[in-house]
Amino acid sequence: MLLPIAGLLDKLVYFPPLSQTKMKLFDTKIIAVSNQKGGVGKTTSAVNIAAYLAVTETPTLLIDMDPQANATSGVGIEVGSYKQSIYDVVIGKAKLSDVVQKTDLEFLDVVPSSAQLVGAEIELVSLFSRERMLKEALEDVEGKYKYIIIDSPPSLGLLTINVLTSANTIIIPIQCEYYALEGLSQLLNTIRMVQKHLNKEL
């Protein structure tokens, strides 16, 4: 029996209602700025990259994953002036979109940090899929920003693993001196482990 073209398409293709679809404006690039050694310009790099992108009218989200919250204050947000932070997101108590703060730059938003993030490593240990908490949270803003810049914590713990599992690009600021290069080899080993087991897109 021959079916009308419209009837045939109805049988072959399912179009979900608009209420069930999520509009993606952008294919988002997620960039981690990471180095477990302090004082190498990690946060300065993350803030300036995010600010430059915003000045070029590129929708950008800066995520502060460092408990010192220097990236938060670096874009003009007073630390502690908000009720929730990235801490609440990574332990599953808040949606990422509910924590986003506007900055003075039209195209730059920030997810602020707080000192509470220090204790998140311990809380994450007991959670299922603890290495992917940030990656899953990012789905909440998928397609809204062209770039997401993540300022990683100065460590190689679970928070940094979360950052590396979420990113598809990594920038490693480094000083050309012995101890910085020694720490680089540890970071590269961690990156290879994440690429092998958690995030092949990194």
Residue spans of the language-model regions?
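P-loop NTP-binding core
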Residues: 1-202
